[in-house]
C-alpha cells in the first residue's frame, strides 16, 4: 500500500509506531486475552495505564507538583463551559481575548455563565491578518481570569508569547491544537486544557492541567462531570472514562519520550513549517494571508491564485496520498495540519506535489 499522509485538522494523524503497537495488542492486551477496551477502568491493569500516562505527560511538559492533571470527557467545547463554572468563584466577569474562531466560540459559551470582558486582538498589518502583542491586551481589574487560544486551527494564527501579566492574573488557555508541540512554562497558567484529537491521541479524551489552589471553587450549578475537584478527587474516574483513548494517548506519550520529547518535536515542527511556508512564500501561485509573526506551525491555510483549480488540486493531491487538505468552510482554500505525528517526509511530499502542480497549472 502506498504511503498516505493525513493532513486532517482533527481527528488527526497518529504516529505509525503507535498504531502498529495498538494493532498488535488489540485482541490480547497485556497478556489478558482481551482488548484494553474490554477491561475495567478500575482494575489494576488499567490503573497502571492511567498512572503511567499521567507521569509521562507530566514529564513531557515539566508540570509542576502544585498542578493537577485531569483526564476528562467533553472536548474543548466542554471546557468552554467548565472554565467559567470552575474558576469564576464569586466574581461575575472574566477577560477573554478574541483572536479567531475558537476564541470566539469560547466567548459565546462563557456568556451563559458570566459577563465576559472581550478584547479583540485581531488586526491587519500590511494587508495580512495578525494579533496584537500581549503588551497591548487590555485586561480588566475585577476579572476572575483571562482566557485565550494560543493556536487557531481554522485561521492558521498562533500566539507564541508566554503570558506575563503578574501573579494575580489567572490565565486559562485552550491548547488543543498546540499542546506538546513546543515547550511551555506551565507555571504561567492557572488552567490549560486540550482536546486529544490533534497532538495527543484519538478523539474522546480531554486533558486539563489546573493549579491546585483553583480547585474547590466550582459553581453550585456546575455538572459533576465538569467539576475539577470531583474529577481530581476521583482520579479522573468519577464515571467510566474513555479508556481506549486514554490508553492510546499513553502510547503517544511514550513515543514522544522515545523520540526526544517536546524539545525535539519543537525543532522538527519548525523545520516542517519553514519548508511549507517557504514554498508558499516563494510562489505567486500560492498565498497565505497571515503575518509571519503569527503564523501557526500546526495549521497552515493557503489559497491558490486561481480558486477554479481548488477541486483539481484536492483530487490530484488525494490521489498522490496527500489526504484531508481541504480548508475549513469558514476560510476555504486549503489547509495542511502538520501536528507532531506528521513526519518531515510527509511535508516534503506535499511541497513536492505543490511545486509540480504549479509547474503544470501555473
From Swiss-Prot:
It catalyses: O-phospho-L-serine + 2-oxoglutarate = 3-phosphooxypyruvate + L-glutamate; 4-(phosphooxy)-L-threonine + 2-oxoglutarate = (R)-3-hydroxy-2-oxo-4-phosphooxybutanoate + L-glutamate. Pathway: Amino-acid biosynthesis; L-serine biosynthesis; L-serine from 3-phospho-D-glycerate: step 2/3; Cofactor biosynthesis; pyridoxine 5'-phosphate biosynthesis; pyridoxine 5'-phosphate from D-erythrose 4-phosphate: step 3/5. InterPro entries: Aminotrans_V_dom, Aminotrans_V_PyrdxlP_BS, Pser_aminoTfrase, PyrdxlP-dep_Trfase, PyrdxlP-dep_Trfase_major, PyrdxlP-dep_Trfase_small. It comes from the Bacteria. GO terms for cellular component: cytoplasm. Its EC number is 2.6.1.52. Its cofactor is pyridoxal 5'-phosphate. Keywords: Amino-acid biosynthesis, Aminotransferase, Cytoplasm, Pyridoxal phosphate, Pyridoxine biosynthesis, Serine biosynthesis, Transferase. GO terms for biological process: L-serine biosynthetic process; pyridoxine biosynthetic process. L-glutamate binds at residues 9, 42. The modification N6-(pyridoxal phosphate)lysine is found at residue 198. Its main location: cytoplasm. Binds 1 pyridoxal phosphate per subunit. It is an enzyme of class 2 (transferase). Pfam families: Aminotran_5 (PF00266). GO terms for molecular function: O-phospho-L-serine:2-oxoglutarate aminotransferase activity; pyridoxal phosphate binding. It is found in: Cytoplasm. The keyword Transferase applies. The keyword Cytoplasm applies. Pyridoxal 5'-phosphate binds at residues 76-77, 102, 153, 174, 197, 239-240. Homodimer. Catalyzes the reversible conversion of 3-phosphohydroxypyruvate to phosphoserine and of 3-hydroxy-2-oxo-4-phosphonooxybutanoate to phosphohydroxythreonine. Belongs to the class-V pyridoxal-phosphate-dependent aminotransferase family. SerC subfamily. This is Phosphoserine aminotransferase. It comes from Escherichia coli O17:K52:H18 (strain UMN026 / ExPEC).
Amino acid at each position: 500500500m502506498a504511503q498516505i499522509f493525513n493532513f486532517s485538522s482533527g481527528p488527526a494523524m497518529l504516529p505509525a509506531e503507535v498504531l502498529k503497537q495498538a494493532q498488535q495488542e488489540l485482541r490480547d492486551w497485556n497478556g489478558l486475552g482481551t482488548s484494553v477496551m474490554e477491561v475495567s477502568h478500575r482494575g489494576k491493569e488499567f490503573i497502571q495505564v492511567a498512572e503511567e500516562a499521567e507521569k509521562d505527560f507530566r514529564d513531557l511538559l515539566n508540570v509542576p507538583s502544585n498542578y493537577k492533571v485531569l483526564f476528562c470527557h467533553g472536548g474543548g467545547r466542554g471546557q468552554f463551559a467548565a472554565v467559567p463554572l470552575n474558576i469564576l468563584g464569586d466574581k461575575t466577569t472574566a477577560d477573554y481575548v478574541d483572536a479567531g474562531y475558537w476564541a470566539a466560540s469560547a466567548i459565546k459559551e462563557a456568556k451563559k455563565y458570566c459577563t465576559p470582558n472581550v478584547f479583540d486582538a485581531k488586526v491587519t498589518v500590511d494587508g495580512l491578518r495578525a494579533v496584537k502583542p500581549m503588551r497591548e491586551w487590555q485586561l480588566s481589574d475585577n476579572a476572575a481570569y483571562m482566557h485565550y487560544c494560543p493556536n487557531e486551527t481554522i485561521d492558521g494564527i498562533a500566539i507564541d508569547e508566554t503570558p506575563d501579566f503578574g501573579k494575580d492574573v489567572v490565565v486559562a488557555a485552550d491548547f488543543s491544537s498546540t499542546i506538546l508541540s513546543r515547550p511551555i512554562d506551565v507555571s504561567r497558567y492557572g488552567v490549560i486544557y486540550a482536546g486529544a484529537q490533534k497532538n495527543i491521541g484519538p478523539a474522546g479524551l480531554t486533558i486539563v492541567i489546573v493549579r491546585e489552589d483553583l480547585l474547590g471553587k466550582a459553581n453550585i450549578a456546575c455538572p459533576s462531570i465538569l467539576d475539577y475537584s470531583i474529577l481530581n478527587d476521583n482520579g479522573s474516574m468519577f464515571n467510566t472514562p474513555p479508556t481506549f483513548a486514554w490508553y492510546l494517548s499513553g502510547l503517544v506519550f511514550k513515543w514522544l519520550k522515545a523520540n526526544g520529547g517536546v524539545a525535539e518535536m519543537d525543532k522538527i515542527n519548525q523545520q516542517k513549517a519553514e519548508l511549507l511556508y517557504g514554498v508558499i512564500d516563494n510562489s505567486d501561485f500560492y498565498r497565505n494571508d497571515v503575518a509571519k509573526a503569527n503564523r501557526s506551525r500546526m495549521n497552515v491555510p493557503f489559497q491558490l491564485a486561481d480558486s477554479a483549480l481548488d477541486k483539481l488540486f484536492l483530487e490530484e493531491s488525494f490521489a498522490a496520498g496527500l489526504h484531508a487538505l481541504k480548508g475549513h468552510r469558514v476560510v476555504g482554500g486549503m489547509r495542511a495540519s502538520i501536528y507532531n505525528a506528521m513526519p518531515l517526509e510527509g511535508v516534503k511530499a506535499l511541497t513536492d506535489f505543490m511545486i509540480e502542480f504549479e509547474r503544470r497549472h501555473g
